[in-house]
């Protein structure tokens, strides 16, 4: 499950690094644009509400949030963005799901295929690895603001599956169908969220050796550096020696 693996912890650290590079600003704005296609009022659009909360958590400027909403609703140009997911394999036979948001799917699929090939991976057919993952909701909260007991009381009552300790933060994990109910229950309780999003959680993880792990991390880095890539999900776990090296 999300947050229960060393790979997930590396992703958290990488997320903070990405934020410094501005990559997360682009990602957050695209998520708002896509969410706003279903309506520009966050009160009646739970996905938009979550997208705005995630954008605020990384300090995306208010004007950029407002412009992204207008692009999604068609008030401004630039909202012609499609959501897609590509499936494939990395070194060691690791399963990969690459989620993208693009205004040119032909360009993006070519770039993703090239990155995979360059780093010892390959593109697969739609559905080739998706069955190895479960769609979950993951809500992240600051560790020093809440106790586990406080979160358990609200989150589990609302239908969350688990509350996990991720070192510097808490993670509330939900089934996809219960995500909005849990997030809204936390909001109603006055809980401030660092992020609230869906993720693909591997049903089983492949343990890789350090050499394969390094190859996989280079592949993931290359994919995430692509402007159209929103998220990369994989079913591998890193060996302790590589975790220490990356940490």
UniProtKB/Swiss-Prot annotation:
It comes from the Bacteria. NCBIfam families: PRK00110.1 (NF001030), PRK12378.1 (NF009044), YebC/PmpR family DNA-binding transcriptional regulator (TIGR01033). It is found in: Cytoplasm. GO terms for cellular component: cytosol. Belongs to the TACO1 family. This is Probable transcriptional regulatory protein DVU_2259. Residues 1-22 are annotated as: Disordered. One of its GO terms (molecular function) is DNA binding. PANTHER family: TRANSCRIPTIONAL REGULATORY PROTEIN YEBC-RELATED, TRANSLATIONAL ACTIVATOR OF CYTOCHROME C OXIDASE 1. One of its GO terms (biological process) is regulation of DNA-templated transcription. It comes from Nitratidesulfovibrio vulgaris (strain ATCC 29579 / DSM 644 / CCUG 34227 / NCIMB 8303 / VKM B-1760 / Hildenborough). Keywords: Cytoplasm, DNA-binding, Transcription, Transcription regulation.
């Amino acid at each position: 499950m999300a947050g229960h693996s060393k790979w997930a912890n590396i992703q958290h650290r990488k997320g903070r690094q990405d934020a410094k590079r501005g990559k997360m600003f682009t990602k957050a704005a695209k998520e708002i644009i896509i969410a706003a296609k279903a309506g520009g009022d966050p009160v009646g659009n739970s996905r938009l509400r979550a997208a705005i909360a995630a954008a605020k958590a990384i300090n995306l400027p208010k004007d950029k949030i407002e412009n992204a909403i207008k692009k999604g609703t068609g008030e401004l140009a630039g909202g012609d963005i499609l959501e897609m997911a590509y499936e494939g394999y990395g070194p060691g036979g690791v399963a990969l799901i690459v989620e993208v948001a693009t205004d040119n799917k032909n360009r993006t699929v070519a770039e993703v295929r090239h990155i995979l090939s360059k780093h010892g991976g390959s593109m697969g057919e739609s559905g080739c690895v998706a069955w190895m993952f479960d769609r979950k909701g993951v809500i992240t909260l600051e560790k020093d603001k809440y106790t586990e007991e406080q979160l358990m009381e609200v989150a589990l009552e609302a239908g969350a599956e688990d509350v996990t300790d991720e070192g510097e933060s808490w993670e509330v994990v939900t089934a996809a169908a219960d995500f909005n109910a849990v997030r809204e229950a936390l909001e109603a309780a006055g809980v401030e969220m660092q992020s609230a999003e869906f993720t693909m959680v591997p049903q089983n993880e492949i343990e890789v050796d350090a050499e394969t792990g390094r190859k996989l991390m280079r592949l993931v880095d290359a994919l995430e550096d692509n402007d159209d890539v929103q998220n990369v999900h994989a079913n591998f776990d890193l060996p302790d020696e590589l975790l220490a090296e990356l940490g």
